[in-house]
Amino acid sequence: MTKEINIKNVKIGGKNSIVIQSMTNTKTEDIKSTLQQIQNLYNAGCELVRVSAPTFEAAKALKTITKESPIPVIADIHFDYKLAIESIKNGASKVRINPGNIGNDEKVKEIIKVAKEYNVPIRVGANSGSIPKELETLPKIDALCESALKEVRLLEKFDFENIVISVKSSDVIETIKAYEKISKMTDYPLHIGVTEAGTYEWAIIKSSAALGYLLYKGIGDTIRISIAGDPVKEVLAAKKLLISLNLRKGIQIIACPTCARTTIDVEKWASIIEKRFSKVEKNIKIAVLGCVVNGIGEGKDAEIGIAGVQNGFLLFYKGKIVGTFKKEEIFQVLEDYIIKVEVE
């Protein structure tokens, strides 16, 4: 089990639930746009948000952003240790530093001094694209882990243990092996993710393959599904991944792939129902099936199911037929049965 640490009011590690994280892609200096995006992420279910601080203007903007953000803000720092110090002083609840470019021991020592004063954790974020030169001759997985652990040992040397670690690669297998390796070498909380995972479809596939495996094995305390695009999609995908692994409560939609027997637009209705009940925080499966031929059989693992019939739906509950309903009635009926599941 990993250590428990606090990121402002959010606890990670130990027996705590897996925490969903994302990152803004607005200009941090544009405080209004950044706060709006953070609010959108929060509304989608984000619990920690990372914000890049590449300039002193951006670091100073964190003073307002951290005060008005509904969730803890993590400052992402590269190259200049002074930006980490400025970010902490302006309210960052955590800082991420890259061991491949943050600088020498004395610079790290200065960051630690301020992090201790403000009780702010440091994430040592190693990734495959910025391995220190002295480690480049090692096998990639060994280099990733040693890059992170070398920086961790430096933090520990200065009596700092408020640490989170990540060892991300853009390759699925490398990511899995690196996290498996480092999880056996330390008990610090692990932030897991596939770095530079790509555009939506590739990012979902690669992240699900790597993170799904790691989470199933009990590895990971915070997660990010990195997508080139709207970060809100990262949060929605992460939430669904956790629900699918029974690591978070929520509605799961079971839907058939459709065939010539289909009497309804399954994709349309499944999407509408999913969106309508996305805020329900109960472990409930709803099946949306195109016809009655295999409807009950295919949806028998679902608490509630609907199958298309002429001019409406056949509704079944826990494997038994309830009755037929018109399309305009179905949402109210589903709501009634969701409440029924919650009560029973």
From Swiss-Prot:
Pathway: Isoprenoid biosynthesis; isopentenyl diphosphate biosynthesis via DXP pathway; isopentenyl diphosphate from 1-deoxy-D-xylulose 5-phosphate: step 5/6. InterPro entries: Dihydropteroate_synth-like_sf (IPR011005), IspG_bac (IPR016425), IspG_bac-typ (IPR004588), NO2/SO3_Rdtase_4Fe4S_sf (IPR045854). It catalyses: (2E)-4-hydroxy-3-methylbut-2-enyl diphosphate + oxidized [flavodoxin] + H2O + 2 H(+) = 2-C-methyl-D-erythritol 2,4-cyclic diphosphate + reduced [flavodoxin]. Pfam families: GcpE. The keyword DNA-binding does not apply. GO terms for biological process: isopentenyl diphosphate biosynthetic process, methylerythritol 4-phosphate pathway; terpenoid biosynthetic process. One of its GO terms (molecular function) is iron ion binding. Transmembrane segments: none annotated. Binds 1 [4Fe-4S] cluster. [4Fe-4S] cluster binds at C256, C259, C291, E298. Belongs to the IspG family. Converts 2C-methyl-D-erythritol 2,4-cyclodiphosphate (ME-2,4cPP) into 1-hydroxy-2-methyl-2-(E)-butenyl 4-diphosphate. PANTHER family: 4-HYDROXY-3-METHYLBUT-2-EN-1-YL DIPHOSPHATE SYNTHASE, 4-HYDROXY-3-METHYLBUT-2-EN-1-YL DIPHOSPHATE SYNTHASE (FERREDOXIN), CHLOROPLASTIC. HAMAP family: IspG. This is 4-hydroxy-3-methylbut-2-en-1-yl diphosphate synthase (flavodoxin). It comes from Thermosipho africanus (strain TCF52B). The gene is ispG.
